[in-house]
Amino acid sequence: MKELDLDAGNSGLKWRLVESGRVIDRGIIIYGANAQKWSMPTKGACRAFVSSVSSKEVDDAIREVLKDIKDVFWAKTASSYGSLVNAYADYASLGVDRWLALIAAYSKYPEDLCVIDCGTAVTVDYVDKFGVHKGGYIAPGGALMLKSLNVNTAALKGTYGYDSELIPGSSTRECIERGVYYMQKAFVLSVARRCAESRIVCTGGGVKALLGNDEAYTYVEDLVLDGLRIVANAVPVN
């Protein structure tokens, strides 16, 4: 039985095709492309699981792509899941991606945790060994910082990326790229130090650039999608 997992984020959509519990295909779609040309292997999939923090337009495009799949599950944030308890008074306002990442992390590692997701935004969430969510932080990711400088500072317009060299730059480009990288790395290391006795679980496309292969961190490639499958498979099939 083939099942399609989708994680619709702020700037792109991550998908993977699972058969008998094994990932057999995966891909990433960057928004902006015509939804009719989105390439996902929907043919043969009997179920689809969706996590989305994106716009109504993206959600509508997903529904169109999945229209031939009978059983489609859309994840929602809850006040609790098993022994995991959401810290937000308005629990539904916690992004479903953060919630699913917490579910996956705590299911894999039921201990004191710091969960870091480096994407368009960098999110940090803490949970204790009893499953009590202690809240967290949200900060702009590197691409957002670079875009802000590009849009709001006329003299700095240009196309920039990450530069992991931490010595001071000797050109405007180097100063911007290294400065943004330094801010990102300092933020992540700072929140990690706050929970030095906890397991630090990291995910997201930007985490490798910031942390490399540091063994002090537990890297899980598909943390949100893993949490999505945990929740979806707990719901009876229609």
Curated annotation (Swiss-Prot):
Catalyzes the phosphorylation of pantothenate (Pan), the first step in CoA biosynthesis. HAMAP family: Pantothen_kinase_3 (MF_01274). Transmembrane segments: none annotated. GO terms for cellular component: cytoplasm. It is found in: Cytoplasm. Keywords: ATP-binding, Coenzyme A biosynthesis, Cytoplasm, Kinase, Metal-binding, Nucleotide-binding, Potassium, Transferase. Disulfide bonds: none annotated. Substrate binds at residues 88, 95-98, 172. Its main location: cytoplasm. Its EC number is 2.7.1.33. It is an enzyme of class 2 (transferase). K(+) binds at residue 117. One of its GO terms (molecular function) is pantothenate kinase activity. Its cofactor is NH4(+); K(+). This is Type III pantothenate kinase. InterPro entries: ATPase_NBD, Type_III_PanK. It catalyses: (R)-pantothenate + ATP = (R)-4'-phosphopantothenate + ADP + H(+). One of its GO terms (biological process) is coenzyme A biosynthetic process. It comes from Hahella chejuensis (strain KCTC 2396). A monovalent cation. Ammonium or potassium. SUPFAM superfamilies: Actin-like ATPase domain. Coiled coil: none annotated.
